[in-house]
Amino acid sequence: YVLDDGTNTAYQYSLSTAWDISSASYASKSFSSFSETSPTGIYFSSDGTKLYVTGFVSDAVSESNLSTPWDISTASLSQSFSIFSQTSLPTGVFFSPDGTKMFVSDTSADSIFKYVLSSAWDVSTASFSQSLSVTSEETNPQDIFLSPTGTKMFITGQNGVVIDEYSLSTAWDLSTATYSTSFSTSSQESNLRGAFFKVDGSKMYVVGVNNDTIYQYSTD
């Protein structure tokens, strides 16, 4: 799935070989009715029945329902949750696997914000929990990803053209995050927008706006 802020649309691709982007082809499926005219971040629930989008104009996270799991053409807007009290420039959105924690990356404060959902995957039940400034490492964070265990966090940085890695001594708790290392993508893309990892962490996928290309890396 790729989110395009030029057309304000999310596009779906099919991979004939799992996790191999060289086998990807456009599935002729898209969705654009997520109440955001400058979308920046996209995320799906674990079962593929919900789609979340954030962006600069609404300063909110929208929630859409998919009547057929993982088929983006069956999505319909359900509701949205304003995050304007914390950020006016949200760039990425991520959820814990159980849908009870939501994380948003932000370029207005160069921070990561955490929200707790009293009802899993229901953004209307979200409440602000904590924040983490990443200014020391990155002054223009574009996306966020956490490992399934919640003990590793990765921030996509536009200014540094790197993926920054953090360790969390307490799972999902931003107050326990410490910077570990970074990986530069400047040889492939110098204007980063997003990063995603395979479930087992063995592959990393990065996208940027300079080349409009997705790059696949092996991490093992």
Feature-to-residue mapping (PLM):
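A short loop-to-beta-strand structural motif that recurs across blades of beta-propeller domains
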Residues: 9-12, 60-63, 111-114, 161-165, ...
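Residue-level detector of Asp-centered blade-edge/turn motifs that repeat once per structural unit
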Residues: 46-47, 97-98, 148-149, 199-200
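Short loop/turn segments immediately following beta-strands, especially the blade-tip
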Residues: 14-22, 65-73, 116-124, 165-175, ...
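Beta-rich catalytic cores
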Residues: 38, 89, 140, 191
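A short beta-strand motif characteristic of beta-propeller blades
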Residues: 27-33, 76-84, 127-135, 179-186
